[in-house]
């Protein structure tokens, strides 16, 4: 499974470290990420608030799961 985590803070880093422990996960990507996250996931330079950019990146990478807080604001789990 390919996972994309959206954000660049401590919460996202902690999520990535736990996701990395799963045997079901093959690749982890993060956008925008940060220097610390880059040790655990491949980072891309797309702003977390650029929803169209994040969607395009997710499609380009053929991810199976996107983890992003901003969807909660739109009433999605």
Q: Language-model segments: which ranges?
A:
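ATP-binding N-terminal substructure of ATP-dependent carboxylate-amine bond-forming enzymes
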Residues: 1-77
